[in-house]
A protein has these predicted regions:
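N-terminal secretory signal peptides that target proteins for export/translocation
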Residues: 1-6
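Conserved polar/disulfide-associated segments of primarily extracytoplasmic proteins
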Residues: 54-175
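Proline-anchored loop/turn motifs at beta-strand termini and strand-loop-strand connectors
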Residues: 34-52
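Short acidic-hydrophobic surface loop/beta-edge motif
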Residues: 27-31, 160-163
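Bacterial N-terminal signal peptides
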Residues: 9-21
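Boundary at the C-terminal end of the N-terminal hydrophobic targeting segment
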Residues: 22-26
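Short, well-structured beta-strand
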Residues: 148-222
Length: 225
């Protein structure tokens, strides 16, 4: 490798590392008269700083246009792939949004309860079947199915859902897990979603643990100093 190529390679590595470090740092968003601190879980980085049309399109596909996207995070490995122009794995990712119609108003506990009821209506009850693959195989392809209620407090509700993709001729069905958390934070209603491909029970444990830890971390980040 020539000296010039070594310098270019070194600079590229430093740039990638700097970008990932910056994206992984906590940041604040202004919602009406409140500043909300946000941060992605460990091992993930926000991508909104990239202003990438490709990533913006991907994030917008996850939520209705009536929501404002505050954070869209990829794994650190995927962010490095994106920086290098390589294909993304997209095995795990997450998003935080807030309803545009509520972002400037202070949300009371009553209004937040109504927001929960409207957002989670029709989910049904969690199944008795604990085998995720067995249960999803019995459900319609592509439908989101409630798997469990993870948390239910006055200021935070979390649910776990799963879906199955249709198998192709040469491939078996794929399974996807997602958690949705509705969180009242500093008088603002936030919706947090985490997505992971399901290959084995460790993915189920990962999304449960990450959902709980992320909510607790955000509440701690926004607690009065």
């Amino acid at each position: 490798m020539t000296a010039v190529r070594r310098v270019v390679s070194l600079c590229s590595g430093l740039l990638i590392g700097f970008s990932v470090h910056c994206a992984a740092a906590p940041f604040a968003v202004q919602l009406g008269d409140a500043r909300i601190g946000l941060d992605a879980p460990s091992g993930f980085s926000d991508t909104t700083f990239t202003a990438s049309p490709r990533l913006q399109e991907l994030s917008e596909s996850l939520t209705p246009a009536s929501n404002r996207i505050l954070l869209f995070a990829l794994s650190d490995a995927d962010l490095r792939r994106f920086t290098l122009g390589d294909p993304l794995d997209l095995r795990r990712y997450m998003i935080v949004v807030t309803p545009r119609g509520m972002e400037r108003d202070r949300v009371t506990e009553g209004a937040f309860k109504q927001f929960i009821d409207e957002s989670l209506t029709g989910l049904g009850t969690p199944p008795a079947e604990k085998d995720v693959v067995k249960y999803l195989d019995a459900r319609p392809t592509g439908s989101a199915n409630l798997l469990a209620e993870l948390r239910k407090d006055p200021d935070v509700v979390s649910v776990l859902q799963g879906a199955r993709t249709k198998a192709s001729f040469f491939e078996r069905s794929k399974y996807m897990l997602s958690s949705t958390t509705l969180l009242l934070l500093r008088g603002k209603a936030l919706s947090l979603s985490i997505y992971t491909q399901y290959d084995d029970p460790s993915d189920l444990e990962w999304i449960r643990t990450t959902t709980t830890r992320w909510v607790d971390d955000l509440k701690r980040l926004n607690s009065p100093r």
